[in-house]
Swiss-Prot record:
The gene is ARO1. ATP binds at G864, M865, R866, G867, T868, G869, K870, S871. In the N-terminal section; belongs to the sugar phosphate cyclases superfamily. Dehydroquinate synthase family. In the 2nd section; belongs to the EPSP synthase family. It comes from Candida dubliniensis (strain CD36 / ATCC MYA-646 / CBS 7987 / NCPF 3949 / NRRL Y-17841). This is Pentafunctional AROM polypeptide. Gene3D superfamilies: 3.40.50.1970, Aldolase class I (3.20.20.70), Dehydroquinate synthase-like - alpha domain (1.20.1090.10), Enolpyruvate transferase domain (3.65.10.10), Leucine Dehydrogenase, chain A, domain 1 (3.40.50.10860), NAD(P)-binding Rossmann-like Domain (3.40.50.720), P-loop containing nucleotide triphosphate hydrolases (3.40.50.300). Residues 857-1047 are annotated as: Shikimate kinase.
Amino acid sequence: MSIERVPILGKETIHVGYGIADHIVNEVIANLASSTYVIVTDTNMARTPQYSKLTDDFKTNLSKKRPESRLLTYCVSPGENNKNRVTKAAVEDFLLQQGCTRDTVILAVGGGVIGDMIGFVAATFMRGVRVVQVPTTLLAMVDSSVGGKTAIDTPLGKNFIGAFHQPEYVFCDVSFLETLPARQFINGMAEVVKTAAIWNEEEFTRLENFSKKFLSVVTSKKPDLQSIKAELVKTVLESVRVKAGVVSSDEKEAGLRNLLNFGHTIGHAIEAVLTPEALHGECVSIGMIKEAELSRYLGILPPVAVARLSKCLVAYGLPVSIDDKEFLKKVGPKRHYVEIDILLKKMAIDKKNDGSKIRCVLLEKIGKCYQLKAHQVSKQDLSFVLTDEVLVHPFTNPPKENIIVPPGSKSISNRALILAALGNGTVRVKNLLHSDDTKHMLDAVASLKGAEISTEDNGETIVVKGNGGNLVTCGEELYLGNAGTASRFLTTVASLVGKSPASDDVILTGNARMQERPIGPLVDALRSNGSEIEYLNKQGSLPLKISAGNGLKGGRIELAATISSQYVSSILMCAPYAKEPVTLALVGGKPISQLYIDMTCAMMKSFGIEVTKSTTEEYTYHIPKGIYKNPTEYVIESDASSATYPLAFAAMTGTSCTIPNIGSSSLQGDARFAVDVLKPMGCKVEQTATSTTVTGPPRGHLKPLPHVDMEPMTDAFLTASVVAAVAKGGSTSITGIANQRVKECNRIEAMVTELAKFGVSANELPDGIEIHGIDIKDLKTPEISDRGVCSYDDHRVAMSFSLLAGLCKEPVLILERSTTGKTWPGWWDILHSKFKIELDGYEPPFNTDKHVIKSSDKGVIVIGMRGTGKSTLSEWLASFLGFKMLDMDKYLEEKLGTDIKSLIKAKGWEHFRKEEAIVAKECFTKFSKGYVLSTGGGIVEGEDARQQLKSYADNGGIVLHLHRDLDETVTFLAADTTRPAYSSEVQEVWLRREKWYHECSNYHFYSSHCSTEDEFNHLRKSFVNYIKLITGAERSVVPTGRSTAVVLTLPDLNNVAGDLESITIGADAVELRVDLLKDTSAAFVAAQIATTRKHADLPIIYTVRTVSQGGKFPDENVDELKSLLLLGIRLGVAYIDLQLTAPNELIEEISSKKGFTRIIGTYQDINGELKWNNVEWKNKYNQGVSMNADIVRLVGRANSIQDNLDLEDFKKQNTLKPLIAFNLGTQGKLSQVLNGTFTPISHQLLPNDDGLLTIGEINQTYFDIGGFTAKKFWVIGSPIEHSRSPNLHNAGYKALNLPYQFGRFEATDVDVVYDNLINKSDFGGLAITMPLKLDIMKFATKLSDAAETIGAVNTLIPVEGGYFGDNTDWVGISNSFIRAGVPPKSSSNGLVVGAGGTSRAAIYALHQMGCTKIYLVNRTVAKLEELVKSFPKDYNLEIVETEQQADKVNKVLLAVSCIPADKPLDSDVLKKIERILSNGSEQVAGFKPTLLEASYKPRVTPIMKLAEEQYKWKVIPGVEMLVNQGDRQFKLHTGFSAPYEIIHRAVVEE
């Protein structure tokens, strides 16, 4: 048993070894005499063999060596959440109860939580007792156990209460790590890497080399630590030595010890937000990279050191970004609580700060800190490194001259790595670009055993020992991110790879964009030469599966090279390893980027293989067989594409910039940029063989370049484009850059789009772009509210626009700044430190919602049986989305010149299906965006069509399956003689197609049978609401106030369909217990949802409760449960209940496919086994938060009143997500009353096994216990004696059991209203009528958008700090239309008659409903002119002054009459109205032209009679507007949804 002793503070008290339990026991008993030894651990550790051995050995030895002493043990709950005052007090109480005294020795056996907390117990118990640290995690061994820091956490931060209390011993028994889960093991490596990074470069290098072996062992199913025992002990030992040495120099953290906090300033702040989901080491790992980037940003740390640190951390499986994919899986939605302001506040109260000044440890190089102390850093600089969005401030005073050395060329770097890996011997590669691209290349080369790779000169030099082309397969996919160069080069390299036991093939893959970029021509060429290559996803793009062991045949290879020269270079570099010499012929026209091909040939020559160009055949190359011989050293030239940015900066700002290592002799085509582009634009250019200097003209005096062919330097066109943007006086045309459409993004399109945000017009050319330059003074600042400048995950887009941004008058937001890491990770640092540009971090507002569908994004395909309403509902759908509608059957008929019935009669169903599939393929491609495609019922019969439908849905399109009751369908089809007869019964056809409809669709709507106009209108409204949800146009908002959900617990809702409206009175949602239905087939469940929607216009909570969670659905039927939950999403329910007890795979799948449906994560303790102070409830809540539930629902069972009070405490402590939490049982009713969000309620007509309360019972009880206070509401104005508002509101209060009263208060003076009503303690709110709608506004401290635009207030309610004014008249108008069957959005035209206050509300309502033009008619035109001036121009208002104008009015479908109904219509007004009504008399857009009367007396007005009887318009009486505005007013006043039918009857039934 070898034991290493490390001195600290003058004593050798740190002992490190493997399997040293005996040594620990002997050392403690022999040297720390005590009457009482106490071992404290947590419940997890207590179950391990190592702990059992330690305690057993202790007992045995103690009885022999100190029989008078005793051993006590104590276990605490595990986890950071328990490192608190409560747990500390519990340990202290135990010690006191056991009679422990000042001679007690405590052994803290566990991870950092135990070490910190029990160390603090020892520091304070009896004013300090001895403690021995026995760390059992890697993190604790190398960090928290050494140095005497002890502490507990508080709600405000970690480790804020504690003491320095040095342990008597620290025993690091590495064998304890055998029990450590892989994640915890990896977690500890962060601190190990940290100590090496700040102090010991030699150890850091060892760690770089140890990473692969370490990770393979600790992540294996049965880790064998014995195989890495020596390295593991050394890892712990070296890290402990660094920390012990620093602590010995600075025990109380006065200066030097601060260095141990490298990565912790930012890391601790992140951890404070993300704990417990994120571990300490994971957060510190991210913190180290961010603080290293800060050092680089400040010009202290070389970029290569950041890259090296990042690579090392990644090699140990640690995250280096908050947005690391695996890290995000662990922290879930908590990621979105990591906000800059929160992090800065956390950092400001860090213990190592000087007051509130934030201090960071800055790295100078690997193994050394800058000035051996922590430094004060600005919040602005921290904000910059903490976010991926940047605000570029105006270039106010840049240096007149600058010398910039860009990083190594990406093109040359990638080629050099391929050549070196294929070559024999060792080469030292200098000035290699350290970027994402080259990292992927290095990783791939190493994985394929192409070379042994190491570093020298602190990472500046890459040492490659090539294996002469002897590559072999590896077991894992080679992930290449968005590295196009790496993917193309490695595709040919992979064809040379031999087989190994690990695999028979090589798989190359990348990110989403990489899987769109073309690689087909290269694959075709390689296949023709014997390579076996398979596309695993999309034809022509990655991922690729390349069979090993085939090699290249050689001989003649033909390659299309008009898209990418990288295809050519890929084959050129690998050609010497073919079985025969290669002749590479480039076909299809002039190759793109010839200079890059020349570069490849020149580099191959440097590595010993000379390519000869054919003298007889154009664009043809001869490559001999051979093996590259690596030169001793190869220096990478700086990147000429990157050099264009600092040179362009000089051109645009009138300054001078020199690139000292790129000149006319460069291998790179982009080296010509200064001479060929900037010089003709008015710059002074001085270029030697090895350097380039550009001096720009005075700012604003650049000249446009009528035409430039940039084919030799295509990547530089983006730089040229932003320069051309401020070259006034003409246009600049850039051609020869067609290949830029298939780079990281479509760069030409991106440039046109983003330039427009600066006010610069540009247009695409067949192979280029034309930019119409403007005066620099006319540049616009892109709107931050419109997300600023998009980078498209493209480094060159980001860098180019960073130049143009600085010429704007205000700061410009650029997204995804880190994308520059592809070629110039330090670009922003150069802007900041060299060009002295002010940069700021920016954090966009977070939006968790999926992207809302727009016409420019996707389309909708509608499928379903014949007779299900596809045509009608498709029209509604197109109208709502603003799409075009295409009936594919009609399209087919037009294309073939015959109707379908005749076609089938003549040629049969089989021929028709073939033609249908051809048309489907054409339509799905040609009309994939901005269209609703209504298909024939049998579209799913063909395999090709089915695959196309599935692909469309998989790629984000909506395939909507419409269905209705089969019996109704049969009846409908029997009466329709226009369609071809089925060759079999409808039932048989349905049974055959049913599974196909489900397979091919991602959404499902059950269309109820309609027998009345009201039912038809309700179907339309339900369908539009459904479309709103599945497209994201309108998503259910989680209530913030008190809300309820009525729980439907019936086997068949059709039994109570007529009562559903009464059952749902007062509820904010309806919860359908799917598990309690008599049939859970998809058809029956869909029909039940349709019934719910037909009778209750409320969000649906879709719940399938399993037996173990108090329901009826079998727990073991996991696949059926998944199908039912996915069906709920397809049915477009607002909320889906997802049990926290479900398998993780199920939770992940539902979460990933939820679309716009919200998730309620639920756990029920049906037996009441858990008290609310049990940590398990906290764990369940955290699980709900982690799985990204929108709401967490926790249900217990109360046995006493205290259970309800404990629940209230729990709710106060857990506020990250909305929480539904209550107890069942008689004793739990109080908790149901106190619950805030979606309290489940029952009804007298429903089974109620859970003892739920009704809405009336809840409201009454809540009032009785003081939750509600009695309030008074009033209608004010004059005259109001006939106002129906009191009837409406009081009827609603009574129905919901609310303690409110609504009365009338006649007044013409608002001050009187204030004194008598508003200023009273029981004031609840006002309904305001004339003449007070304007005067009342002086009391409103805040106005709604509607009230501001309309310019009047009809509703006033008290809010914190004042009063909120709203106008619900417009809602009364719009909802009256909608309830009458008018779609909520339609691009029709509207008419408003009148010019008073209600007219303003009518205009606002019609605009909100999507009217493209609103015509105005009134007796006095001057009043209309004033009205038009008060509305924004986009309302598109037009005054109709004459009858002639009325004749020319475009078809009007919506009209609102806002003129007094008790007086005869003015004859001139009447004539104009009649002409307009006559023009809109026919039904279009799926609804009948409709007129709303704003006056509710008399019931039928003259204009209503005219419209209905003479012009056949649908009319809506004014009483409907009154009810609908009151419905919204009721919600504003009380927070409750009004019982609509009840308030309607109260108003209508006088």
